[in-house]
Swiss-Prot record:
Its main location: membrane. It is a peripheral membrane protein. HAMAP family: NDH1_NuoD (MF_01358). It catalyses: a quinone + NADH + 5 H(+)(in) = a quinol + NAD(+) + 4 H(+)(out). It comes from the Bacteria. This is NADH-quinone oxidoreductase subunit D 2. Keywords: Cell membrane, Membrane, NAD, Quinone, Translocase, Transport. It is found in: Cell membrane. One of its GO terms (cellular component) is plasma membrane. The gene is nuoD2. It holds the Pfam family Complex1_49kDa. Belongs to the complex I 49 kDa subunit family. InterPro entries: NADH_Q_OxRdtase_suD (IPR001135), NADH_UbQ_OxRdtase_49kDa_CS (IPR014029), NDH1_su_D/H (IPR022885), NiFe-Hase_large (IPR029014).
Amino acid sequence: MTTDAELRELTVGTGAGGEQLGTDMVLNIGPQHPSTHGVLRLRLVLDGERVVSAEPIVGYMHRGAEKLFEVRDYRQIIVLANRHDWLSAFANELGVVLAVERLMGMEVPERATWLRMALAELNRVLNHLMFLGSYPLEIGAITPMFYAFRERETLQAVLEEVSGGRIHYMFNRVGGLKEEVPAGWTGRARTAIGEVRRRMPDLDRLIRRNEIFLARTVGVGVLSAAQAAAFGASGPVARASGLDLDLRRDEPYLAYDQLEVPVVTRTAGDCHSRFEVLLDQVYVSLDLAEQCLDQVDRLTGPVNTRLPKVLKAPEGHTYAWTENPLGINGYYLVSRGEKTPWRLKLRTASYANVQALATLLPGCLVPDLIAILGSMFFVVGDIDK
């Protein structure tokens, strides 16, 4: 015989008792999705169209780069160093050679230092243009992609001429650069920078104040400065939340201490702020690259250091970090005096930045998910290594 109490327990099961009955939906995004460079999986718990919890699941592109470093000599590791973040290839190989040079106490020719800075800033612009074109595409704006890739091709031709590679440059060497740049290259690079600077307002006007773009991004995916700091976020993601941090200014390497590096920041911490920081950083990097080219033209001398046939680093350890296009990358190198690293640990910007998704996504709507995910500007290979 059913009592009144049992009847009451049954009727509670609709509506208010939904949580106890497990009516929330678990949704897997990925492990393949068009808004990522690579393969990422998100495990979401949804209440209707609102995200209750989010868990980024990484590792699908893990290729064991850090273990492979241990069986490659100090010349060969450069080949691997630029592959985990293929949009920041020059910056990645630069960080590795800086760590090796620091451990060996090596002085790099001044001309090579300024050439490295010029190429690093051009690589930064190429990275940013990729996201400036692909991010609007993810939320329905097709045209900006064509503008962004027009500018990318202009600068890509310059880097391809100097290194021979379009994506994986492999132009850095321990002690400097692979070889001297072609005759007249600095002039052609300066011309390309001028063309991109002149045409960038076309992309700027097309998207920055577009009403539909503003509706999809303003106030969406807000990451506070405290949250960004807690997750170790850096680069455009952190600066859009108000963290005024840039290693080129705060912990200068190469010859950045001889330049005035403007740091672009915002305080809103939303998707639109992250996009604006990326856009404005393009102008800054174009200016810095041009200043570096001016210095290169004033300097003479070699661009590399003569090295022994077998290159061995002394026993010890060191840490080098760089301001990569997507944020701070760190390189912890341990040597036992052999021709291969005993350990080379990578601290990548994308890995730190993507952790914030677990805090950023809960509370948002499913239609806003792609807008938030795309605005975090990460490369999955940089996460998984």
